[in-house]
Amino acid sequence: MIFGYVTQSDKVEKRISITPEIVKKLNKENIQVLINKDYGKNSNISDQHFVDAGAQVESVEKIYSSSDVVVQICFEDPETAKLLKKNCYLIVNHFNKNNKELESSLKSKNINIFSLDLLPRITRAQSMDILSSQANLAGYKAVIDSVYEYNKAIPMMMTAAGTVTPAKFFIIGTGVAGLQAIATAKRLGGVVSATDVRAASKEQVESLGAKFVFVESAENLETEGGYAKEASEDFKKKQEELIKQTIKNQDIIICTALIPGKKAPRIITEEMVLSMKPGSVICDLAALQGGNSAFSEPDKIIEKNNIKIIGYSNFASRISESASNLLAKNIYNFLELIYDKESKSIKIDMEDEIIKNTYVGESN
């Protein structure tokens, strides 16, 4: 079989879906690997490294037309879809079901699509979990980027000239990204507090040495999969008041609150932003989904009242070498599940929960 890997053409996405290490593994299974020119450039991997591992460098058109399996971070161009080999398999991080023109193009060629962001949260799928591996790095990078924009030292320093007080971090949302943000901020010497609508996250937050700030409520705001779900209006009002009182004393705020399939909840209002100390920084990981914070805009740093609001849309891509290494392993583990070594072909077992969840179907 031929597996083809193509980079994204947009400026924000710098990650790749395969590394030379994975190329070698696929070659051992008699799988031919094709990549486009400069495939690993943004992750500091030269074409020669890929070639030495056993990959072939081909044009994008050749890859699309000859590959039995095409792996790409995102696939959104209906015209490009026309280049794909009929009946091939398309594996992406996220498939946009609302792109009807793309859907029509893929359906006309009977393309089978897997969207890896739909992996179930079960133990067997952990090694394939692209959301967790990338969110972990995003939480780390969000803290690093925030510290870069912050104009003071982070840890407490006691010197002959006086004492430098530690920076105060407030983490909103304690999923994978939020927990890594807490851990990173603590390692840098910050004083960290965090909040989440899920009461169950209290233990995790405190185990990392942070203070948990929480609205007491009888509501269960956690899905069976462990994600946060939308709160009632009464809860939102209580949460808003709690955050309003907390936020004014913070130096750096990291926002990571997302609700799967919905617009990001607006947690920090304009009034809250303007109540913060001059020089403070807000880092909004949800900017692309509408933003947790007022004023945040995707891929921009906005300054209001001497307060910076960071809205990068893809924090994992900003640390692309590490992100690509983890992503490539996640995807390889998924490929191992659907590739049958005996028949040397892709086999779709719809009884398998992982395949059933991720299989978007024939562009359906």
Per-region residue spans from a language model:
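Glycine-rich phosphate/diphosphate-binding loop of Rossmann-like nucleotide-binding domains
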Residues: T7-I45, A153-T246
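A structured beta-alpha segment of the ubiquitous adenosine-cofactor-binding alpha/beta core
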Residues: G54-D68, E76, T223-I253, A257-L274, ...
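Glycine/threonine-rich flexible loop motifs
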Residues: V12-S17, E79-L83, L258-I268, S293-A294
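An N-terminal-biased, well-structured beta-alpha scaffold segment characteristic
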Residues: M1-K109
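Glycine/serine-rich phosphate-binding loop and adjoining beta1-alpha1 elements at the start
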Residues: I2, Q8, E76-K168
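Rossmann-fold NAD(P)-binding glycine/threonine-rich loop
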Residues: K97-T123, K262-A316
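Adenosine-phosphate binding glycine-rich loop
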Residues: D117-L118, T123-A160, P166, S293-N364
